[in-house]
């Protein structure tokens, strides 16, 4: 959903397409899938006022082979791949990630829905650093996302946001770099 915020979305218009993946039949996997469906489909989506009208499931996520006369098997962990989409009344209010250095006294602001927890489990960075596990990013309070959508829409309407980029695909440094590339500018960050 944060990827969509560059556009003037309204949460009730947001829909999700969900691909639920699990190695059903493996110990604990059916229960883990149920907990995932419950958390997303029965708790988070209703709290946000959004729905999942489309999707698919892949419930045999395992591989099995024979090696040296022994059967080996690797089940995939429960995974959920989500795409979000929304209809817009007018696309002209959509922001780009392009930083603009022609204006004086602008500030690049990080809004941290993770509340300083820096959860990186499963990220590419964690994998590169050999720390693939750990706590994964999560939305602790649905109201935080609702408030963010509301605030961004108000600030956009008031002309107070010049550019937008979420940090879900690589974190703060990747977002800042992509914004600088888009604007053909350099950037100096002071992270307090």
For each feature predicted by the language model, list its residue ranges.
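Alpha-helical support elements that line or immediately flank enzyme active sites
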Residues: 1-5
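Short, well-ordered loop/turn and helix-capping segments at boundaries between secondary-structure elements
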Residues: 6, 87, 111-114, 178-185
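Glycine-rich phosphate/pyrophosphate-binding loops
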Residues: 7-16
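Glycine-rich anion-binding loops of enzyme active sites
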Residues: 15-116
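Glycine-/charge-enriched secondary-structure boundary and capping motifs
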Residues: 30, 39-40, 44, 48, ...
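Gly-rich Lys/Arg/Thr-decorated short loops/hinges at beta-loop-alpha junctions or inter-strand turns
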Residues: 79, 120-138
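Short, solvent-exposed amphipathic alpha-helical segments in soluble enzyme
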Residues: 97-102, 125-128, 176-182
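Long, low-charge, small-residue-enriched segments that form tightly packed helices used
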Residues: 139-143
């Amino acid at each position: 959903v944060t990827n969509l915020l560059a556009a003037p979305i309204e949460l009730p218009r947001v829909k999700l397409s969900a691909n639920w993946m699990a190695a059903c039949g493996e110990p604990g996997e059916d229960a883990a899938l149920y907990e995932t469906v419950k958390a997303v489909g029965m708790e988070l989506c209703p709290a946000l006022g959004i729905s999942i009208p489309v999707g698919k499931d892949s419930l045999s996520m395992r591989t099995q082979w024979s090696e040296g006369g022994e059967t080996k098997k690797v089940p995939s962990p429960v995974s959920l791949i989500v795409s979000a989409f929304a209809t817009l009344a007018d696309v002209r209010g959509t922001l780009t990630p392009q930083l603009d250095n022609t204006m004086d006294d602008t500030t690049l602001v990080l809004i941290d829905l993770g509340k300083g927890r820096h959860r990186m489990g499963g990220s590419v960075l964690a994998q590169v650093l050999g720390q693939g596990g750990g706590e994964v990013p999560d939305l602790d309070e649905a109201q935080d996302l609702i408030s963010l959508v509301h605030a961004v829409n108000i600030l956009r309407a008031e002309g107070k946001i010049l550019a937008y980029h979420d940090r879900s695909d690589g974190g703060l440094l990747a977002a800042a770099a992509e914004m600088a590339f888009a604007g053909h500018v350099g950037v100096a960050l002071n992270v307090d």
